[in-house]
Every structure is written in C-alpha cells, then in structure tokens.
Amino acid sequence: MQAVETPVLGQVHYRDLREWLALVEGFGELTHVKGADWHLELGAISELNYRRKPTPALLFDEIKGHQPGFRVLTASSSSSRRLGTCLRLSTDLTDAELVEALRGRPLRWEQSAPRYAPRVVSDGPILENVREGAAVDLSLFPVPFWHEHDGGRYIGTGCSIITCDPDTGATNVGAYRCMLIDDRTISVQIIPGKHGRVHYEKWFAKEGRAPLVVALGGDPLLTILSGLEVPTGISELNY
C-alpha cells in the first residue's frame, strides 16, 4: 500500500452557489442540460449520470413548462474536486487526498463550533425577489417528479430545513424531504429521532404550529452539513 502525502490545502473562496458553479465550470466538471421534462426525465438523466465515472454536476435549465433561469442542480458533490471545493479545502483533490485532508477535521470542527456564531445581516440577494401572501406561487419552480413510484413532486431533496428549539433557541439544519402539495403548500417529512422532529414536536405541544425555514439553492456547504449527524448542542450554522 502506498502512503498518501498530506495535501497542501489552498484557500477556496466563493460567496454563494452562483460563484461555486463558476468555479466548477472552470475546472470542467459542470454540464448544462436544456429542455428536460421535470416529470421523470430530469430524474432519469440524473440517475444515469450518477452511474458515470467521472460524474459531472448537471445544471438543468429551460425545463419544460418553466421560465429560463429557474434551474435544478444535481450531483453537486459527487466528485472529490467538487466536494473539496464545497468544503473550501481545495479545487483539485483526488479521492485519497480528500480522505487525508479530512482526517481529524470533523472533531476539530465540533470543538471550535461555539466560537463561530452566525452573523445576522439586514440585506442580501435572498431579499431581491420576495413574494408574500396571495402572491406566493410554488408552481413557478420546476419541481421534479424524480422516480416512477414517488408519492409526488419533491421540491426538497438537496435542501436545508432550519428549525429552532422553542425553549432554548438552539437551531438545527437538516435535509428533510419536502413534497409539493399545491401552489401554496408543501409537506415536510421529518422522521422520529431527528433534531428537527424534536423541535417541531415541542412547538406543536406549545402552540399547535411550528415555524421553519426551507432553504433551496444556498451555499453548497450548508447543503452538505444539513445531511450530517452533528452532535446535539451544536448547530450546523456554527459547525
């Protein structure tokens, strides 16, 4: 067995998903797909792509029945280079180098998380397009019907669901499935035992409702963290 040298990690800078897409396209791992149908075709293309080696990220646009610019990204972190970029480690890590780069880091991230509280800001691109009340229309989004026997169209697969504990204010970010019910409603599936489920059960016991945020198209790093088992007491927003 050949030893793997500890990789030299450079600083990777990107502010949002758009800048991340530009980085990935720059090193040749982004494929544009135009004109796919949200009903099964988008999911089938994505499934076949996952079986390819190497596996590029796919950016779907001009999806059937929807305006250009309403896009869907799949396979965002399905290569060492893209995962290393998401984690802001390096843009050119091999599989072995990524494993070496991550050695011991999760524990250090857990230990240092309390020192990195989220910073609340009053402005940002997320506030450029706002729809409230009767103007809410989820049909604008090209929500895929991914697989033949799915129960519906899932808008939340690579997503971040943010909840908080009503007693302590502690936050949690999880990747829970969200299904489109109608133009104004989605359902969120959080199985028992998950931190988000603990939070909303507390809210329902107190007020009969539970506030939460469904974040789509955010920083790819947050999407990855949403799927991790971060220990109780540590928020993914700090981690």
Label each residue range with its predicted role.
Residues M1-Y239:
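Extended, highly charged
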